UniProtKB/Swiss-Prot annotation:
Statement: the UniProt record of this protein carries the keyword Magnesium: no
GO molecular function: galactose-6-phosphate isomerase activity; ribose-5-phosphate isomerase activity
Protein family per UniProt: Belongs to the LacAB/RpiB family.
Source species of the chain: Streptococcus equi subsp. equi (strain 4047)
Protein name in UniProt: Galactose-6-phosphate isomerase subunit LacB
Length: 171
């Protein structure tokens, strides 16, 4: 099984710990970045994880930022992605079993590495429990998706990053 994983600069160490754990369990990890602590932007890496899963390069995805809120929102903008921000086993299992989530997100500064690893392993092993009710819920969620052709442009974030480099945006 292939797992795409991505993060922002705040939780690079946590992502590497999760990646190492997944590899130790025999999973193939597709590391979508970031790879160091240089200031960056979580939407870039949420999009990369989402695209890897949506395009079939990965079976599931894991996104991590400081709180998990930003990167989970970003990955959910990729058509075909159903991601849940999780901090406990119950939420992760519900997301997979009832809503067929294909990505989970974490706040790496909120949820510890060991707990993240336990939750991810349970998420991977859980099966979607297809029922008529679940299928209808997922169809309703999918109906909300909007497709933005600009997202497919490899330079989607270039203008934003150029403005950042010029100092137009600040934390």
């Amino acid at each position: 099984m292939k797992i795409a994983i991505g993060c922002d600069h705040i939780v690079t160490d946590e992502k590497m710990a999760v990646s190492d754990f997944l590899k130790s369990k025999g999973y193939e990890v597709i590391d979508c970045g970031t790879y160091d602590h240089t200031r960056t932007h979580y939407p870039i890496f949420g999009k990369r994880v989402g695209e890897a899963v949506a395009n079939g390069l990965a079976d599931l995805g894991v996104c991590i930022c400081g709180t998990g809120v930003g990167i989970t929102n970003a990955v959910n903008k990729v058509p075909g992605i159903r991601s849940a921000l999780v901090r406990d086993m119950t939420t992760a299992l519900y997301a997979k079993e009832e809503l067929n989530a294909n990505v989970i997100g974490f706040g790496g500064k909120i949820t510890g590495e060991l707990l993240m690893c336990d939750i991810i392993e349970a998420f991977i092993k859980a099966d979607y429990k297809e029922t008529e009710e679940n299928k209808k819920l997922i169809a309703k969620i999918a109906h909300l998706e909007s497709h933005n052709a600009n997202q497919e442009d490899p330079d989607f974030f270039t203008e934003f990053l150029d403005k950042w480099d010029r100092g137009d945006y600040h934390d």
